[in-house]
Amino acid sequence: LGTSKPILRPNFVVNRSGREIRELLKFAPVGSDITFVVCDTETGEELESFNPLRSLPPASVMKAITGFYALETLGPEFSFQTRLMTNGSINNGVLEGDLILVGGGDPTLDTDALYDLSKLLSEFNLKTLTGDFKVYSSDWPSINSIDPDQPSHLSYNPSISGLNLNFNRIFLEWKRKEEGYSLSLEARGLKARPSIEGIKVKLSDRTSPVFEYKKLQNNETWTVARSSLGQTGGRWLPVRNPALYAGQVFQRLAMEVGIDLPAPTVIYSMPKGQILISYESETLKSMTKSMLKHSTNLTAEMLGVTASSNFSPVSSLGASSHKMVRWLEERCNLNGVSLVDHSGLNDQSTISAKSMVNILRDSRMQIQIKPLLKKIPYRKKKGQKIFGDDIKIVGKTGTLHYVSALAGYIDNSKGRNLVFAIFVSDMRKRRNLKNHEKENPRGSTSWMNSARYCQRLLINRWCRL
């Protein structure tokens, strides 16, 4: 594709010469910007660096920072609460009043959790109600998407609300039939797979774009280009009205256990009444570990916004991430940090390798986040370890098209412990992507392979320092 140099295997002697670093960096993608720093974890001595103050996008490496911010601000045992409330009473199977589904900001709430809530509600012998079924997303800001420059159909760029469901996604499945295709949209869980009325999908005879989205009042509609579909398949699509989506899914689940609810209505002020049932999420520590493993953007944004809201209300991701930067500045020596989100999905969020390393060196960061990071197993082709058991590498990766980031810790029981950050990007290539190229641009795979190989060479080198 001609976008990167071929990946060669250099033969060099490991030493700490500037010349060797320059030779090694020749294996990075052509024309890319690079910043890296490696230092002694305990003393802070900088061992090697390249453009240490250059600010580049950290991509999902940002999630390690957000996790630290949330755990320190809210505490590892913090959990989110989703509640069913009422302003009436149940008599002879009839709720005389309203039923309200109240979100508590839980980014991991799913169809199975709502299924469990509906089963618990049925234990009240409720059959119907005289009032309304309402949904309330609490005081969290409602945000249409994390990064407005991303294509509308990417499920990893969802809306954000105080009432989220299935990471604010719905599953589209298509099946080839003799007369064409059958399409379905489901709020898929392990216990239930309800369809809802508020989100629809239709086939289109256009050639491009593959997906097109429209929102009219409370209804969301997707159209899919017929020519883009294969035999049978499926993918997640984002939901742009998550509170209503959660309400519609709960309405269907309640129907399955014999409770007749009216169509949900979204309300915008805190309802009065008593709690019938409360659903508690997993602990923040467990949620953060899962976020770092699976790199879920919605979780990162909700953890960051919730932590910022602990100080004062926030109205946007930018305002929330700015609070996080100010909080970090009080504890770490930062230079070249400009953040607009908590997940790193937006490439306008940038940080220098030097600042990233300073954050990773923070003693509380090492207590809170280091044990939650994934092991980075550098092995030869046949599975042999490059290094012995005396060396352990953990870290967080970050990937956008033409952005590759890696930061973490190298612990050596026979030597010194290190902390490192490596950011590689080509923002010119990224900025030149047309909208239809943004999901899978030509040349991005070879670019990414080259960037990751360069990162691996640096890690291999530092393990021998």
Model-predicted segments: where are they?
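A conserved catalytic-loop motif detector
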Residues: 134-200, 348-389
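Beta-lactamase-like hydrolase cores
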Residues: 2-55, 115-124
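Small-residue-rich helix-loop
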Residues: 47-49, 301-465
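Mid-domain, small-residue-enriched loop/turn segments at the edges of structured enzyme/sensor domains
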Residues: 33-35, 92-164, 168, 308-355
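Active-site SXXK
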Residues: 44, 58-76, 133, 163, ...
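A small/polar active-site loop signature that marks catalytic segments
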Residues: 200-370
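Short, well-structured active-site flanking segments
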Residues: 72-87, 262-265, 369-370
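Short, surface-exposed beta-strand/loop micro-motifs that present aromatic residues
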Residues: 89-90, 207-215, 404-412
